[in-house]
Amino acid sequence: MTDLKPFLAKAASREPLTREEARSAFDILMSGQATPSQIGGFLMALRVRGETVDEIVGAVASMRSKMLTVEAPADAIDIVGTGGDASGTYNISTLAALIVAGAGVPVAKHGNRALSSKSGAADNLAALGVKLDVGPEIISRCIAEAGVGFMFAQMHHSAMRHVGPSRVELGTRTIFNLLGPLSNPAGVRRQLLGVFSPQWLVPLAEVMRDLGSECVWVVHGDGLDEITTTGITKVAALEDGKIRTFELSPADFGVSPCVLADIKGGDGVANAAALREVLGGAKNAYRDVSLANAAASLVIAGKVETIHDGMTLAAQSLDSGATALALDKLIAVSNDID
């Protein structure tokens, strides 16, 4: 089918789409066969009614079928957030990814430029000197040689160009805010996945289970799409096909609570400077919150069994210079410098 109208009519009637219907609808959206008005109407019908697990699974299946893929080790992990929390923090997942790579776990990081903040992962890494517009072979080399590779979302999801203008005109969150982090081009099966609202914790864990993930922690920390050290982080953890929920506090990571202002960042250049300070030995709230996210990621990766052990290994990665070396190698390989 190449006509969105039947799916639009069903969504507008507040009826849920089946997984297969959702995939067909998103195939139409992302192949340029729907008008801007149809795209906007369909996305808002889903948003107002509330997207279902089956609809998200179908939409992700469509996105994954069209993306430019990257080869990565089977045990690679991604640390990624949906964005949309409007918090303007430092690039926590970026530093956490480098720490995890320095600890010996391959990272296939997926990200984009900022949408609701001043600096997304892509802005931060570009300011650090990482080349973004590279092909799958170079990214695979980055993962193999640096322990971490960055997949710039717009390079891997070209079909999104068909819905981009409608999303901009709508000016509000749509299902696509959720789909990017669920569509990792390296097909990772282990993730630390931050979400902008706690309402999505369990539903996205269910989505990842249905899509075949092995271990995923979906987290929301005190308004952030990260594990936070400002207060309580809520977690829905997918492990061995089962989902459990729990909470984490700064004390669980052995760090002192901070306030949001302590981890507020700036643009890509400012955040790059802050990241370099931590690599240089600065002991501050940015270091603490990044270590916390890295520690959880090391548990998810199966590298350690406890958060405590994860914090120990993450701190070793940072303090030994292994994290800085991972960044240096990522910059060199992405720029194809021998």
Swiss-Prot record:
Keyword Amino-acid biosynthesis: yes
UniProt-annotated binding residues for Mg(2+) 1: 93, 226
EC number assigned by the record: 2.4.2.18
A GO BP entry: L-tryptophan biosynthetic process
Catalytic activity line of the entry: N-(5-phospho-beta-D-ribosyl)anthranilate + diphosphate = 5-phospho-alpha-D-ribose 1-diphosphate + anthranilate
Xref: SUPFAM superfamilies: Nucleoside phosphorylase/phosphoribosyltransferase catalytic domain, Nucleoside phosphorylase/phosphoribosyltransferase N-terminal domain
Residue positions binding anthranilate 1: 81, 112
List of residues binding anthranilate 2: 167
GO molecular function, one term: magnesium ion binding
InterPro entries reported for this sequence: Anthranilate_Pribosyl_Tfrase, Glycosyl_Trfase_fam3, Glycosyl_Trfase_fam3_N_dom, Glycosyl_Trfase_fam3_N_dom_sf, Nuc_phospho_transferase
Cofactor: Mg(2+)
Keywords, in A-Z order: Amino-acid biosynthesis, Aromatic amino acid biosynthesis, Glycosyltransferase, Magnesium, Metal-binding, Transferase, Tryptophan biosynthesis
Entry protein name: Anthranilate phosphoribosyltransferase
Species: Rhizobium johnstonii (strain DSM 114642 / LMG 32736 / 3841)
Biological classification of the source: Bacteria, Pseudomonadati, Pseudomonadota, Alphaproteobacteria, Hyphomicrobiales
Name of the encoding gene: trpD
